[in-house]
Structures are given as C-alpha cells and as structure tokens.
Amino acid sequence: LTVKESIRVASDISGEPRIMLPSLYCTVFGTLTAMFYCRMVEMRPVRSMGAVKKGALRSYLIGIAVGIVLMSAITLLSVLFGVNSIAVRSGINFGMIALYFGGFLVQGMSEEFIFRGYLMNSVGGKHSAALAVGISALAFGLAHAANPGFNALALLNLVLFAVFASLYMLNSDNIW
C-alpha cells in the first residue's frame, strides 16, 4: 500500500460511527497526558497551560459560540459562492448528532490543550511568542494530514486558524 492508499483506507474505516465516535471521545487521553507531562515531568502548574478555573465555563461557552459563528460563516460563504448547498432532510437522528457534537467538543478541547496549552506554552517559555505560535500552528496543521481532502490549501487554512486560536489564547491568557 502507498501512503495515499493507506490514508484512503484509514479515512473509509474511521468514517464509520462505531469507529469515529470512540475515537473522538478517546482524545481526552491526549489532554490528560499533556496535563500529566506538564505537571509531573516539567514541574509546571496546569495553570501554565492556560487552564484558568475562574470563569472557565463562561469562557468555554464563549469559545463554543465563536466556533459556531466561524463555522456558520464558512458554511454560508461556501453556499453563496456555489461550492456547497444546504438541503433539509427527513429522518434526522438527533441523538447521533448530539453524540458527534459532544465528541467534537472533547476532541477540540484536546487539540487546544495539546497544541496551544502544552506545545505553544512550552516553546514560548524558552523562545519568542512568534516562534511558539508558528511551531504550534504548523504542528496543528500537520496533525490533520491524514484527514480526507487534506492538501496545501487545507494546511494553509488549518495553520491560519491555529494562529488565530493561538493569538486568542495569548490575548486572554486562558485556554477556555
């Protein structure tokens, strides 16, 4: 198998809910590992990863709202420019949608802790903020290389989003 064929097979398999849903929820172990490593190996408080207790729920909900606004804008722009269309379907499984939504919340939080909470702050503690943002943004983009449809434009968009998320975190000093 070539790398391209391997990625296609992995994408086909991982698209099945019985594989995808547990995979999304299991990313919480990446968060716990990053926290453990930060605390026990680097001897830094978890707070150094941007995990602020005060107002965490409010900040997290604001982050979700920002994400919904950004994704809605992308969707609407793609419809306006004829790239995608929106269709209403009957027989929607709202339970499955809720499971996926919860899974993507966990997976998104895990990516934040790994790439911005841990990696960006670890690099930033020894080097400039610009280098820390650049390294964590590029790592974030490359971590999605096995995603279906990944190409140079997808990498650029992921890196740009990661720069935005990094600057947002640096401005608020809060991962939530």
Where are these regions (language model features)?
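Structural signal for the C-terminal ends of transmembrane alpha-helices
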Residues: F36-P45, Y168-N171
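Functionally important transmembrane alpha-helices
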Residues: A154-W176
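Membrane-interface helix caps and helix-loop-helix hairpins in membrane proteins
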Residues: V83-S90, A143-A152
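Juxtamembrane helix-loop-helix connectors linking adjacent transmembrane helices
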Residues: T2-S23, R44-S110, M120-G125
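Membrane-interface helix/loop boundary segments of multi-pass membrane proteins
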Residues: S110-I135, L167-N174
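Small-polar-interrupted transmembrane alpha-helices in polytopic inner-membrane proteins
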Residues: M71-S72, F104, S128-A145, L158-V159
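Alpha-helical transmembrane segments of multipass membrane proteins
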Residues: L1, C26-F36, V66, L70-I74, L76, L105, A137-A146, ...
